[in-house]
A protein has these predicted regions:
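N-terminal [4Fe-4S]-dependent radical SAM core
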Residues: 1-3, 142, 146-187, 556, ...
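A short, flexible N-terminal coil/short beta segment enriched in small residues
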Residues: 1-20, 29
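Glycine-rich beta-alpha loop elements in corrinoid/cobalamin-binding modules
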Residues: 2, 18, 25, 32-161
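Radical SAM enzyme core and accessory elements
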Residues: 2-6, 44, 57, 107, ...
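Residue-level recognition of beta-strand->loop/alpha-helix junctions
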Residues: 7-9, 36-39, 62, 330, ...
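Proline-aspartate-enriched helix->loop->beta-strand connector
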Residues: 55-57, 226, 354-355
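Radical SAM [4Fe-4S] cluster-binding motif and immediate context
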Residues: 166-320
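A structural motif corresponding to the C-terminal lobe/cap of the Radical SAM core domain
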Residues: 240, 252-255, 261-268, 272-438
Length: 583
């Protein structure tokens, strides 16, 4: 009996926690399924080839919002070339309309609904027993499935009771297959909140994995020095003792390499947790915080509990530690959130200066409260995944398109981290930073820039063009701010054409490095190098403005040390060497 678990991931670096967990569960019962992982960017032909040549008796496919269309196409064609293979689907994208799926695809054997660890194991054993002529549970006795019986009739069994999370088998015994990929880990399941747009709100039965077991498994990741472990817990810190124990453990066993990502509710963070977080190695932890909106009416309508004042306090206090990457989320298209309201929400969250500001758009998921109340909100969304909002009674499609442009500009100019010093100077021109991103998005559209790909330097050039033509700003000043940002990121091999001619300070630069090679006062970590090597390994730039301060007219000499970098931005350490440079 050959059973294959199939996943179609969004990117190669992603791994599918579900199929590996199901595999581990089945192996405990003496069934050894294989795994085939693909990505949404692979050709259908290559996926079909891989599955066909496996000659499977049973194929089970994991279905999510990002892959369901591909999966539907794949199984339709696969059934044609392997008609005897039993095809099962599972996952959140099929659990809530299983009967409809079986009617739509008459070749499907069944759908696994809800938690699949035990369900899949019982299905795998069922088919193995069939092959070996052994007795055991029939499909009629397996909870958590909708299936087709021997006569072709669609039958639905009761949903399976949720299981103890400590009984879930660890799927990462062999880490070789996960090299250069993100490890996903689950220490709890369920969510204490009832956000109307989220499927996690359906399962309010919070269950936690035994902490001793969690520590043992995290120790394994740390020993293996995996690059990143991403916790998929919906609200990691909803139980303080659980969160504190894990954070303390990874702090005490930090290997200097592994990074841990957590999704948290910032307003639940306590003083004790804050104190611990502020002691962590820079880069050890990333925090993702879903704000979604700061409109009180919207927050109430989506059944979300959030004290934005507390969120602001916590995010700011974490930011002061300069050791934790913070990723904040907003969602456009929620009830009572019109364009003006979203503009205010954006300004509120942008003011917190997270390392990443994610602008998402409401996705209307089957099974969610929002799905059941679309008529009430006059909410119209795409018929196919990702089921993204098109318009609501508060947000017309014209405004959705504008917000799409803002999203793109934020991604390019803020989240890229390539304009860290330039953006604050531009923001001085605006009452609300949202307006800058909107105007820049309009400029991209008007010039046709949105239709083409642009390299890094071109992004700077377009921004300069915008500031000159649309804002009538001092181009010389912003050129120098952008030169600062460019060299902060890397020691440029090709000098940007809009930078000043460095021959203006050639002699002073040589004198500076010769003196530094003698004194080692500013670059002590370069003790093994002579002055010419220092000059190549670092960068010295003369500015006509106070680029690290007020932006006022003032000569500043900045030394970029690429051996020392900011743990959050990745930018080189910048040293003001103005004093005595021209002496």
């Amino acid at each position: 009996m050959k059973i294959i678990l199939t996943a179609v991931n969004a990117k190669y670096i992603h791994s599918n926690l579900a199929v590996y967990t199901l595999q581990a569960s089945a192996e405990k019962a003496g069934v050894f399924p294989e795994i085939r992982e693909f990505t949404i960017n692979q050709s259908k032909d290559s996926m079909l080839r891989s599955l066909f040549l496996a000659h499977a008796d049973v194929v089970c496919v994991s279905c999510y919002i990002w892959n369901i269309s591909i999966v539907e196409d794949l199984i339709t064609e696969y059934h044609k070339i392997s008609p005897k293979t039993k095809i099962w689907l599972g996952g959140p994208e099929v659990s809530y309309h299983a009967e409809e799926m079986l009617e739509q695809y008459p070749f499907l054997a069944g759908i696994m609904k809800g938690e699949g660890e035990v369900t899949f194991r019982e299905i795998a054993v069922y088919y193995q027993n069939q092959e070996n002529g052994m007795e055991g549970k029939t499909l009629e006795e397996i909870h958590g499935i909708t299936y087709r019986d021997a006569d072709g009739a669609v039958k639905s069994n009761p949903w399976r009771p949720v299981m103890d999370r400590s009984e879930v088998d660890f799927p990462y015994a062999n880490l070789k297959k996960f090299e250069n990929r993100i490890i996903y880990y689950e220490s709890s399941r369920g969510c204490p909140f009832s956000c109307s747009y989220c499927l996690s709100s359906i399962d309010k039965r919070l269950r936690f994995r035994n902490l001793d077991l969690v520590k043992k498994e995290l120790a394994f990741f740390l020993e293996q020095k995996v690059p990143q472990v991403k916790f998929v817990d919906r609200t990691f810190n909803c139980k303080k003792d659980h969160a504190m124990a894990i954070w303390k453990f990874i702090a005490e066993h930090d290997n200097g390499v592994t990074n841990f990502h957590f999704e948290i509710a910032a307003d639940l963070i306590t003083e004790e947790e804050l104190e611990l977080l502020n002691t962590l190695r820079p880069g050890l932890v990333q925090l993702e915080i879903g704000v979604q909106s700061t409109n009180p009416q919207t927050i109430e309508a989506i059944h979300r509990k959030m004290d934005f004042g507390k969120v602001t306090e916590i995010v700011n206090r974490i930011a002061k530690g300069r050791n934790i990457h913070q990723h904040l989320d907003l969602i456009a298209g929620l009830p009572y959130e019109d364009y003006a309201s979203f503009r205010r929400s954006f300004a509120d969250v942008y003011a917190l200066r997270p390392q990443q500001l994610q602008l998402g758009f409401l996705k209307v998921l089957r099974g969610s409260f929002m799905y059941e109340h679309t008529k009430e909100y006059d909410c119209h969304y795409q018929e196919r995944e990702p089921y993204e909002v098109l318009y609501t009674k508060w947000l017309p499609y014209d405004d959705v398109l504008k917000l799409k442009d803002v999203e793109e500009m934020v991604e390019v100019y803020y989240n890229s981290g390539q304009f860290v010093h330039t953006l604050p100077m531009i923001e001085r021109l605006y009452e609300n930073p949202f307006d800058f991103f909107q105007e820049l998005g309009d400029f991209y559209r008007a010039k046709g820039y949105s239709e083409a790909a642009h390299n890094r330097i071109q992004r700077y050039e377009i921004l300069l063009e915008f500031l000159r033509d649309e804002k009538q700003q001092d181009e010389a000043f912003f050129r120098q701010m952008m030169v600062l940002d460019l060299y902060a990121r890397e020691n440029m091999k090709t000098r940007p054409h809009f930078a000043k001619d460095p021959s203006e300070w050639k002699n002073e630069s040589r004198n500076f490095y010769q003196k530094e090679a003698e004194t080692r006062t500013l670059l002590p970590s370069y003790a093994a190098y002579d002055w010419k090597q220092l000059q190549r390994m670092t960068h010295l730039e003369v500015f006509d403005y106070d680029v690290l301060g007020s932006g006022e007219k003032a000569r500043r000499v900045i030394l970029f040390d690429y051996q020392k970098r900011d743990p959050l931005t990745g930018n080189a350490e910048m040293i003001d060497c103005s004093s005595g440079f021209y002496a």
